[in-house]
Regions:
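Beta-strand/loop-rich accessory regions of lumenal/periplasmic or secreted enzymes
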Residues: 1-140
Length: 140
């Protein structure tokens, strides 16, 4: 995975103040945080473009639509369902695909003063407004 956005670590609406805008690269498997209980991880905020390729450079390019501004991007080796249903890392299945998510925004993850802390109001998505989003993707 290569991306032009915030990095190099995962970033969320409430977890990005220490991140720097730049071009970063890692392996899809490296986007899985080593939490004791698998959970949401690996998001990249304020992404202008991202590439997911194999060793030969074949893959997909995802680009923000200039009218929408930067996007949230993630590439993980598991689906959200697989992550949410595993109580321990060893319960995750063998890796056999890459799951890409592209979105206009993603709410914060909370947990800033303890593991049970809810997301602060300013980092929640507005549910009373219509949200539209477009992006471009093409094969490489």
């Amino acid at each position: 995975v290569e991306w032009y956005g915030l990095g190099p670590a995962e970033t969320y609406a409430d977890r990005k103040k220490g991140a720097k805008l730049g071009i970063y690269e890692n392996m899809v498997k490296d986007n899985m945080a080593r939490y004791m209980v698998p959970q949401e991880c690996g998001a990249k905020e304020e992404v202008r473009w991202a590439k997911v390729t194999d060793r030969k450079g074949r893959g997909m390019l995802f680009e923000m639509d200039e009218n929408n501004g930067p996007m949230m991007f993630s590439a993980l080796p598991y689906t959200p369902h697989e992550i949410e249903n595993a109580m321990h890392p060893y319960e995750l299945p063998e890796v056999h695909y890459t799951v890409v998510r592209v979105a206009k925004d993603q709410m914060g993850v909370g947990g800033d003063d303890s593991w049970g802390a809810r997301t602060h109001k300013e980092y929640l998505l507005k549910t009373d407004k219509k949200m539209e989003f477009s992006f471009v993707f093409k094969g490489l």
